[in-house]
Design a protein with these regions (language model features):
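A short acidic, often aromatic-flanked loop/helix-cap motif at beta-alpha or helix-coil junctions
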Residues: 41-43, 135-138
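Conserved beta-loop-beta/alpha segment of the NTase-like Rossmann-fold superfamily
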Residues: 1-53
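Catalytic-core segments of class I nucleotidyltransferases/pyrophosphorylases
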Residues: 25-26, 58-136, 142-145, 149-151
Length: 152
């Protein structure tokens, strides 16, 4: 049972990441939503429009979210959305997910949490990015094979 004041983190199952638990806890405490991101990973260059992106204002405040569309000419340098999101309160996730469905804001005929994050940013909630130390994607068979042995 999900309580409205519960902290809620939602993520995909086709990746792994290294991150600082203390850093993410601090960001969750200071924001309504944290979008988990990575940068400078060659995986993005294969199909840049397969990802979502976040434009930030220093140091880590999200000011724009794009789903399945690049935001610059060099997407590898941008905050790329991992597919993990931490909501300080579950009620924020529930409210903005319901709004997304009510507005029928689909991308490629599907609803995405990237779009929930975009609604949160446009509603002036405090949204931050959490740039992970390392991202390991295994969303495609090639990615899985290439990342079976993870090098530190």
């Amino acid at each position: 049972f999900l309580k409205k004041d519960d902290t809620l983190t939602i993520g995909t199952c086709d990746n792994g990441m290294y991150y600082s638990q203390a850093k993410i806890n601090n960001k969750i405490d200071k924001s309504d939503l944290v979008i988990w991101t990575f940068k400078n990973n060659k995986i993005v260059s294969k199909n840049p429009n397969m990802y979502g992106y976040v434009r930030t204002k220093k140091p880590d405040n999200a000011i724009f979210v794009s789903c399945k569309k690049t935001i610059s000419k060099v997407p590898g340098n941008d905050h790329t959305i991992i597919g993990a999101f931490s909501f300080k309160k579950a009620e924020t996730f529930l409210k903005y997910s319901k709004d997304l469905i009510k507005l029928n804001k689909k991308i490629n005929k599907e609803f995405y949490l990237d779009s929930v994050a975009k609604l949160c940013v446009s509603s002036k909630l405090t949204v931050k990015v959490n740039l992970v130390n390392k991202y390991i994607g295994w969303g495609t068979p090639t990615d899985f094979i290439n990342n079976m042995v993870i090098k530190n």
